[in-house]
């Protein structure tokens, strides 16, 4: 039963006085504000707008907001907007385990999963900390057994390969984190299967040895269609290799689920079942048992450091005044561009190959959370909400879509991420210095641009001149970490989680449900039964009928 408390006393963000004040500021100065001029006017601009986060282990991440299209007055009004939207009240409700996901009547408590200080955290009057810690201890024991070689397959061989079968949050998080922290891996290989396309599971199984492979089936309900279909194919492959002996399944399959009945029916020993509660949303689940593949890959101590890095950002988000609250500032800038500059997209470009899946992970976090059009006041929003988030690692991205960022007609606010220290400082750190020079240069170029006079001074004439002009004044946030460690990665993810939270709180939407994924699933079941027959289909619109019937002819 959904809670009636929508955690806001306004229906639309446009009702808030600060929203109207920001609209006036945009017209008066925002749309004409030139960042280059702002730097010239204020020698302390960088010191004022750059914020340093100190992690639990003393490592630092610098967030430079100074190249954004704001001044002191605009920033003050954005902070006032956060106050009027009661962002901190909603934040506190989340951290207190209240059911802020009101359409499903659930708490939003992924923050409890990284509570390594083990302080009491309650949902419905129950302290969930002991249960969360018990699952982590179970993960630790299992991880150490597998990594040490003590866990044996049915022929007595140790595990060499782990295959995580999941989809959505049960896949995107573990894939991204294992790639990002590959430097910390030892000899265990991890593979991920998510797509229902048979190619994904077939290509993954092709080179694996069934005697040394461990499968993790990641599905809270153990009924997710794509995941259970892929898991069943994996089980059939395993049985085809071992002579069909079902008793061996328990040595090669574990479940990340809470449905003991279905897990047991599948053949998995429930001792190897790792659960998590319904207050853990899929896109926030990498901190839970869903992160078991990560712990197996990098070791439990590193996984715990990953949790602690996120916990440190949680502490910052809760305790830091709004003016210096790094995730809150990131979220407010996003609202400023989306709603007042009509920016429809947001670029995240990591200047780090290990982070090559980070933008894909953030796509789900941002777009599934804030791709909503109805507010907590149960009315349709009369303003834009979630941005289209995209990105690729740089410098590759510079040779593909950066042209659009520099000279296109759309304003695309961008986040650039770099670690100062490389895990691979080859050629006397030459590669890292080239990478860093591009990180700094791209942000500077987007800000300063190049005017006609400069273009002409470089020898361009006539009709070529306008083609070589860069308007500049394109906003960027530069995020500079010391090194990509488990703690740093945990902190970066938590930063973007709380940015997303802040956006949703301002827009007064529920960032924690995802009804938009349901309709397609329902229709897919109907069409699935139609594909099982040879009959010509005529029950849909002519386009869908035509496509289905052509598919049936060609299959």
From Swiss-Prot:
It catalyses: alpha-D-glucose 6-phosphate = beta-D-fructose 6-phosphate. GO terms for biological process: gluconeogenesis; glucose 6-phosphate metabolic process; glycolytic process. GO terms for cellular component: cytosol. Its EC number is 5.3.1.9. The active site is at 368 (proton donor), 399, 521. It comes from the Eukaryota. This is Glucose-6-phosphate isomerase. D-glucose 6-phosphate binds at residues 169-170, 219-224, 364, 368, 399, 521. In the cytoplasm, catalyzes the conversion of glucose-6-phosphate to fructose-6-phosphate, the second step in glycolysis, and the reverse reaction during gluconeogenesis. The gene is RAG2. Pfam families: PGI (PF00342). GO terms for molecular function: carbohydrate derivative binding; glucose-6-phosphate isomerase activity; monosaccharide binding. Keywords: Cytoplasm, Gluconeogenesis, Glycolysis, Isomerase. Homodimer. Its main location: cytoplasm. InterPro entries: G6P_Isomerase, G6P_Isomerase_C, Phosphoglucose_isomerase_CS, SIS_dom_sf, SIS_PGI_1, SIS_PGI_2. It is found in: Cytoplasm, Cytosol. It comes from Kluyveromyces lactis (strain ATCC 8585 / CBS 2359 / DSM 70799 / NBRC 1267 / NRRL Y-1140 / WM37). It is an enzyme of class 5 (isomerase). Belongs to the GPI family.
């Amino acid at each position: 039963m959904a809670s009636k408390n929508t955690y806001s006393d306004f229906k639309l963000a446009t009702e808030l006085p600060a929203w109207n004040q920001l609209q006036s500021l945009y017209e008066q100065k925002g749309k004409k504000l030139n960042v280059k001029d702002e730097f010239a006017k204020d020698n302390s601009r960088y010191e004022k707008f750059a914020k340093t986060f100190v992690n639990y282990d003393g490592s630092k991440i610098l967030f430079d907001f100074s190249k954004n299209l704001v001044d002191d007055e605009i920033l003050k009004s954005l902070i006032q907007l956060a106050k009027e939207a009661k962002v901190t009240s909603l934040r506190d409700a989340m951290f207190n385990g209240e059911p802020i996901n009101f359409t499903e009547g659930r708490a939003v408590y992924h923050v409890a999963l990284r509570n390594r200080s083990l302080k009491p955290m309650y949902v419905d009057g129950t302290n969930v900390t002991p249960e969360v810690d018990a699952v982590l201890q179970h993960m630790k024991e299992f991880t150490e057994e597998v990594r040490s070689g003590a866990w044996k397959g049915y022929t007595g061989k140790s595990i060499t390969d782990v295959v995580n079968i999941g989809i959505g949050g049960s896949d995107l998080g573990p894939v991204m984190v294992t790639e990002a922290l590959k430097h910390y891996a030892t000899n265990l290989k991890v593979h991920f299967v998510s797509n229902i396309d048979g190619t994904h599971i077939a290509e993954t199984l092709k080179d694996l040895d069934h005697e040394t492979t461990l499968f993790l089936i990641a599905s809270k309900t153990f009924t997710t269609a794509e995941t259970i279909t892929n898991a069943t194919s994996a089980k059939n492959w395993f049985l085809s290799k071992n002579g069909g002996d079902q008793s061996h399944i328990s040595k090669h399959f574990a479940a990340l689920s809470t449905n003991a009945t279905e897990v047991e029916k599948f053949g998995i020993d429930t001792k190897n079942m790792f659960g998590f509660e319904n207050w853990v949303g899929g896109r926030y689940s990498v901190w839970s048992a869903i992160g078991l593949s990560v712990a197996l890959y990098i070791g439990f101590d590193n996984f715990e450091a990953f949790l602690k890095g996120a916990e440190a950002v949680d502490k910052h988000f809760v305790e830091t005044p709004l003016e210096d609250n790094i995730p809150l500032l990131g979220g407010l800038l996003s609202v400023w561009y989306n709603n007042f500059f009509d920016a429809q997209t947001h670029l995240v470009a990591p200047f780090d190959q290990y982070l090559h899946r980070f933008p894909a992970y953030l796509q789900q976090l941002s777009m599934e959370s804030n791709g909503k059009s109805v507010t907590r006041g149960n009315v349709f929003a009369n303003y834009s909400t979630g941005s289209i988030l995209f990105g690729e690692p740089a410098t590759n991205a510079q040779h593909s879509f950066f042209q659009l960022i520099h000279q296109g007609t759309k304003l695309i606010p961008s986040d650039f991420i770099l670690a100062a220290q490389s895990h691979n400082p080859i050629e006397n750190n030459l590669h890292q210095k080239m990478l860093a020079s591009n990180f700094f240069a791209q942000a500077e170029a987007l800000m300063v641009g190049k005017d006609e006079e400069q273009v002409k001074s470089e020898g361009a004439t006539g009709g070529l001149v306008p083609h070589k002009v860069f308007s500049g004044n394109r906003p960027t946030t530069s995020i500079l970490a010391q090194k990509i460690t488990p703690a740093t990665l945990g902190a970066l993810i938590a930063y973007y989680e709380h940015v997303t939270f802040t956006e949703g709180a301002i827009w007064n939407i529920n960032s924690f449900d995802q009804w938009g994924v349901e309709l397609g699933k329902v229709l897919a079941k109907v069409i699935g039964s139609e594909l099982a027959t040879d009959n010509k289909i005529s029950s849909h619109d002519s386009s869908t009928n035509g496509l289905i019937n052509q598919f049936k002819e060609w299959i």
